[in-house]
Amino acid sequence: MGIKDWPEGEGPRDKLLQKGAAYLSDAELLAVLLRNGLAGLNAVDLARSLISEFGGLRNLLCAPKNQVCRLPGVGPVKYAQLQAAAELARRVAQENLQRGQVLTNPDLTRDYLMRQLTDRSYEVFAILLLDSQHRVIQFVELFRGTIDSASVYPREVVSLVLEKKAAAVIVCHNHPSGIAEPSQADRRITERLKNALATIDVSLLDHMVVGDREIVSFAERGWIN
């Protein structure tokens, strides 16, 4: 039975309008984005099958286009709708960390970085630029791809810091594997960046590694002195 044949008020869109999005399951929310299913599967059933196929919403949103679009009932249009929803969530998170906001709450920073980086299927190295009062200047994604000590260039970081007149920075990157534990390469990158920034009297406050549901802070581990 298609969703249009369900009793009035029972479809996911009706439920969202009547009760709010928080009352919908993951499959129902996804069905609202998908809008329709295919022969033999309504939108909710299709949503459930996609979540099951990829092992969760995060994996679905991180999956490359070719992996998503090869499945019955999902083409470029539906893939674009899902990616647009994911990007909107990132931009809402970015608005929560506005220019000029003072970073006095570590949980706010963690939540922001989680929303920015957890749903990427590739590695991203980014920098949060702060002024002398630790107010936000800008969040910038610097490098994408395989992040190792050879692919992160301290001179580019220093150049950006000078351009934006930052007094302190927090660097971060994600592990698409979902495991946030830093590697030895991560520690080498951090040391090189700390030394490079010290030459221009800019403090490296932290390096945060973002996993699936956790963030590892170098500062909390005592790895940044």
UniProtKB/Swiss-Prot annotation:
Keyword list, A-Z: Hydrolase, Metal-binding, Metalloprotease, Protease, Zinc
NCBIfam families: PRK00024.1, radc
Matching InterPro entries: MPN (IPR037518), RadC_JAB (IPR025657), RuvA_2-like (IPR010994), UPF0758 (IPR001405), UPF0758_CS (IPR020891), UPF0758_N (IPR046778)
Motif (JAMM motif): 173-186
Protein name (record): UPF0758 protein Sputw3181_0338
Keyword Aminoacyl-tRNA synthetase part of the UniProt annotation: no
Keyword Secreted: no
Superkingdom: Bacteria
PANTHER family: DNA REPAIR PROTEIN RADC (PTHR30471), UPF0758 PROTEIN YEES-RELATED (PTHR30471:SF3)
Gene Ontology molecular functions: metal ion binding; metallopeptidase activity
Residue span, MPN domain: 102-224
Stated family: Belongs to the UPF0758 family.
Record organism: Shewanella sp. (strain W3-18-1)
Pfam families hit by this protein: RadC, UPF0758_N
GO biological process: proteolysis
Residues that, per the record, bind Zn(2+): 173, 175, 186
Highest classification ranks of the organism: Bacteria, Pseudomonadati, Pseudomonadota, Gammaproteobacteria, Alteromonadales
CDD domains (alphabetical): MPN_DUF2466
